[in-house]
Amino acid sequence: GFGATVTTLTLVSIKDRGASALLTTDDVSYLGVALDDFDGGLVGLEDLLVFQAYDVDAVINKAAHGDGVTVPAKLDWSTFTSTGLDISAAQGLLNTTSLGNLTASVDVAIDGGVALNVLSGVLVAKGDFTIALGQVKSALLPSGALQDADAMTLTLTNVGVFVGVGGSLNANGTPTDYSNDTVENGTLGFGATVTTLTLVSIKDRG
């Protein structure tokens, strides 16, 4: 399993009933989720894999149409305004993680750190990561500037890696704080550091 602590978890859900309150097929549902300061680890597989995530922020932005076919636009939670039930505090929390505003172009975004040790030192790694999934538009893509294309970005920073025999994670005197862990090379293998690794992938739907 997975044991974790979360400083703040925020969820905002809105259902637009459409033109007819009696029909569900014209309803549109909107969901915004923000996870602020998540720390957790894998439990039960310590002999095979030690996996600890720390200082993780995550956001999710989704929209669904009641007919199950139409793909509605997601909300920009940073500019959305409403009256009635006061959702301003919760809405504000959707936009105050380290990932910035939760806009309509974001599906999922995650930022944080991870420390892992596979098979007692065969693969040891520690570093920070940012992942974002969403949409972009560009006149330079075959589908043109009016069509969404799926995009993913992955950035790894300050990564230390060892692959071989006898690697380990040095807790540096703070066994419950993984943010200051360092990778210790083993007796035989390959050790490396990466300041920044960036990957951008775009899929044009045609």
Stretches found by the model and what they are:
Residues 1-206:
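N-terminal low-complexity, acidic/Ser/Thr/Gly/Pro-rich segments
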